[in-house]
A protein has these predicted regions:
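Conserved metal-phosphate-binding beta-hairpin within the catalytic cores
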Residues: 127-162
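Oxyanion-binding "anion nests"
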Residues: 101-105, 112-137
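Active-site nucleotide/adenylate-binding loops and adjacent lid/helix of ATP-dependent enzymes
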Residues: 1-61, 82-83
Length: 262
């Protein structure tokens, strides 16, 4: 019945209301993923029937699929002080997402960007609603309309928010200055381009589909969340090597080009 009442056509994107909630992580059903992409009503119903046979009783979020690949996404991180004034904004252009079932939709690599018009619009919105704290805003550029479609606002920094540090912005320092010391400076608007990545360079070279982006990334040394030159304990280096090696296997097995498949 839900599929028949959708205000948009297939393809669609479907995800649990909280894919990190214990009731979803602990349930098991065939084809379980963090996020689903469906071309047809039949594909969607097959998943729902499978899910209904599990212990999951939460809600599902259904969204229209906006055409475009990973690089059409945008993520905006900001910090609003205790008075509701935005103090920092950093825009990122994801160039690659994860595709394995447990991580699909999470960003694997991001180029930090600047966009004055978008900063202005989102700053006015956040201040108008009296938002306080960190915000992690996911959106996608819709080439059909020339506008951004805002998906969600997360009230925390995301796992990929280290791209802000690559651009030179320390969100945690801003929080400390505000809450602990009561210091509030002018709003910082990032305009620096820098590369953050949580996967090896070889994966970016192979799976980033835009030739222009692949060429642009060659200009930047990637900042990696997991790598720390001051902590080269053999056990840690070994675990990192295993993690990076596993990414080659995961992408080879699960990757698909959204811009072509949909």
């Amino acid at each position: 019945e839900v599929a028949d009442r959708l205000p948009f056509d297939f393809p669609i994107v479907v995800k649990p209301e909280n894919s990190n909630a214990l009731d979803y992580l602990r349930c098991h059903f065939e084809g379980q993923k963090k996020v689903f992409f469906f071309d047809t009503r039949e594909e969607y119903l097959t998943m729902v029937r499978s899910m209904n046979g599990s212990d999951y009783r939460g809600k599902l979020i259904l969204q229209e699929f906006i055409p475009g690949g990973d690089d059409a996404m945008r993520v905006l991180n900001s910090y609003s002080d205790t008075d509701g004034t935005v103090r920092a904004m950093c825009l990122g252009q994801p160039v690659l997402e994860y595709y394995d079932p447990k991580s699909v939709g999470n960003y694997a690599a991001i180029l930090s960007r600047g966009d004055t018009l978008l900063y202005d619009k989102m700053q006015r919105f956040l201040q108008a609603i009296g938002y306080v704290g960190f915000s992690n805003i996911d959106m996608k550029y819709d080439s059909r309309t020339g506008r951004y479609v805002l998906f969600e606002i997360n009230p925390r920094l995301g796992r990929s928010s280290f791209f802000c540090r690559a651009a030179g912005i320390n969100m945690m320092k801003l929080l400390t200055e505000d809450v602990v010391y009561g210091r509030r400076g002018k709003c910082i608007y990032n305009e620096t381009t820098a590369l953050w990545s949580n996967v090896p360079r070889g994966i970016l070279t192979r799976y980033v589909t835009s030739p222009a982006l692949r060429e642009e990334m060659k200009q930047y040394k990637a900042l990696h969340t997991l790598w720390c030159g001051g902590d080269l304990a053999p056990a840690r280096v070994y675990r990192l090597a295993r993690y990076y090696a596993a990414q080659y296997k995961n992408f080879a097995r699960y990757y698909f080009d959204k811009s072509k498949e949909k």
